[in-house]
């Protein structure tokens, strides 16, 4: 199977999360019984791509063997990229990262560009924490683009990219094969994997969480049991597909938050076969098996956890990816929307579709909000008043929605861009100012 981004993919996918996959685009391209034969089939080169340390425990060890037309080392030297440099990877105090305010923050959607702009040039960092160089924390980017990548390819050496499209499909051609991703789906591109993005719908906008630390994994289910939340079989990895093209191409690398470019005389998407457990994947959020209360109270949002990146502290993650999908609410004598909250963790939210059930106005698809450690948040005044008098003897379906959250153990620091942009809603705090005083010590 060869790569062709001009039309939808026809190849199927490999099912399962972090499975040991094996796939070949030409029969017999995978060596039999060994990884690095003296001569690989079809004159290919054997190359290992390691996503974890060689000595990581077997259950956490992630690597793949690629059989490609040319090794990844074949390109000209990198030089600083002359295009937009709007990415940040170090979140200590700097010109790019001013002091973090304790205010609740909310943004309108990133505008679509006027000039032709592809996926790489459409990236901008909104917030993050930790350090790409130290391999801990994350960066949260937005993208807005209106042109497919043309004869250029991209990879991030800083972290794995969790991509959440909000508008427009993405045809993502990678070294491992192709992912077609639409809104309501996510894609994860591992650290170091080279790829190109085509925009079949013209305009595209979305969110990215770049994970600098331990790889994303499925959470343990505990008392939920052996099934529920995001089921492993619904994660899809591409089958091998390649292109054998020569010409004047550009390879763009992201390292320590900076973009670099190199000339390359061939397409780096030339992997004819591969096997291993370190590969891109996608997941349809509409397949999430939502858990909730059928008696009383609103459980903690951890019941909506899709993926997590673990820290060195048991039970505390560096990143939690949480969604708020369509679901039934059945709890009686209960305030059904998400409750008022202050959190030791920090929460960056986005909205793919519809409305979020804790906010009646102002939080729109493509927009974002940030509630940092111990900043009070959740229902606005209108939502509280309506939910306080609603009939809870009948189930209610929250429909036509898809919100999500990147939650982190450490402070999420907005960038200078995020604090200065015209999309920042200066009046966000007003949504709570109409909350009334109902207290009456004479009436219980």
Swiss-Prot record:
Entry's transmembrane regions: none
Coiled coil keyword on record: no
Gene Ontology CC annotations of this record: cytoplasm
DNA-binding found in the keyword field: no
Entry keyword set: Dioxygenase, Iron, Metal-binding, Oxidoreductase, Phenylalanine catabolism, Tyrosine catabolism
Coiled coil (UniProt feature): none
Annotated catalytic residues: 298
Top-tier EC class: oxidoreductase
Binding-site positions, homogentisate: 356, 377
EC number: 1.13.11.5
Record Pfam families: HgmA_C, HgmA_N
Any single biological process term in GO: tyrosine catabolic process
Residues the entry annotates as binding Fe cation: 341, 347, 377
Pathway involvement of the protein, from the record: Amino-acid degradation; L-phenylalanine degradation; acetoacetate and fumarate from L-phenylalanine: step 4/6
Cofactor(s), names only, from the UniProt record: Fe cation
Catalytic activity, as annotated: homogentisate + O2 = 4-maleylacetoacetate + H(+)
Molecular functions (GO terms): homogentisate 1,2-dioxygenase activity; iron ion binding
Functional summary from the UniProt entry: Involved in the catabolism of homogentisate (2,5-dihydroxyphenylacetate or 2,5-OH-PhAc), a central intermediate in the degradation of phenylalanine and tyrosine. Catalyzes the oxidative ring cleavage of the aromatic ring of homogentisate to yield maleylacetoacetate.
Family the UniProt entry places it in: Belongs to the homogentisate dioxygenase family.
Quaternary data: Hexamer; dimer of trimers.
Entry protein name: Homogentisate 1,2-dioxygenase
Organism, scientific name: Burkholderia cenocepacia (strain ATCC BAA-245 / DSM 16553 / LMG 16656 / NCTC 13227 / J2315 / CF5610)
């Amino acid at each position: 199977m060869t790569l062709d981004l001009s039309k939808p993919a026809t190849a199927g996918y490999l099912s399962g999360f972090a499975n040991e996959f094996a796939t070949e685009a030409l029969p017999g391209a995978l060596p039999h019984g060994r990884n690095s034969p003296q001569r690989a089939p079809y004159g290919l080169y054997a190359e290992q791509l390691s996503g974890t340390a060689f000595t990581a425990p077997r259950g956490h060890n992630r690597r793949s063997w690629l059989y490609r037309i040319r090794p990844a080392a074949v390109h000209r030297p990198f030089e600083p990229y002359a295009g937009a440099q709007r990415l940040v990877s170090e979140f200590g105090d700097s010109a790019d990262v001013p002091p973090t305010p304790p205010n609740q923050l909310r943004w309108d959607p990133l505008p679509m560009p006027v000039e032709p702009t592809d996926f790489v040039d459409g990236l901008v960092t909104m917030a993050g924490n930790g350090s790409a160089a130290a391999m801990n924390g994350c960066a949260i980017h937005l993208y807005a683009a209106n042109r497919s990548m043309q004869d250029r390819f991209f990879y991030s050496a800083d972290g794995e990219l969790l991509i959440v499209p909000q508008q427009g499909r993405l045809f993502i051609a990678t070294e491992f094969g192709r992912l077609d991703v639409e809104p309501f789906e996510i894609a994860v591109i591992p650290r170091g994997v080279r790829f190109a993005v085509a925009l079949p719908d013209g305009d595209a906008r979305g969110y990215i969480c770049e994970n600098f630390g331990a790889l994303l994994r499925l959470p343990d289910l505990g008392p939920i049991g052996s099934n529920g939340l995001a089921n492993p079989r619904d994660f899809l990895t591409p089958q091998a597909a390649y292109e054998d093209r020569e010409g004047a191409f550009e390879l763009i690398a992201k390292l320590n938050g900076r973009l670099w470019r190199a000339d390359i005389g061939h397409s780096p998407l030339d992997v004819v076969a591969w096997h291993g457990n370190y590969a891109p994947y996608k997941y349809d959020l509409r397949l999430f098996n939502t858990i909730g209360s059928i008696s009383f109270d609103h459980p903690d949002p951890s019941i909506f956890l899709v993926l997590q990146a673990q820290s060195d502290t048991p039970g505390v993650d560096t990143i939690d990816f949480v969604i708020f999908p369509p679901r039934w609410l059945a709890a009686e004598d209960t305030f059904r929307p998400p409750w008022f909250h202050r959190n030791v963790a920090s929460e960056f939210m986005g909205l793919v579709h519809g409305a979020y059930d804790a906010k009646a106005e102002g939080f729109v698809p493509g927009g974002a909000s940030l509630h940092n450690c111990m900043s009070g948040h959740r229902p606005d005044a209108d939502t509280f008043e309506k939910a306080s008098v609603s009939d809870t003897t009948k189930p209610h379906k929250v429909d036509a929605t898809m919100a999500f959250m990147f939650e982190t153990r450490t402070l999420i620091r907005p960038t200078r861009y995020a604090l200065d942009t015209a999309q920042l809603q200066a009046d966000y705090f007003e949504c709570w100012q109409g909350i009334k005083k109902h207290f009456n010590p004479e009436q219980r």
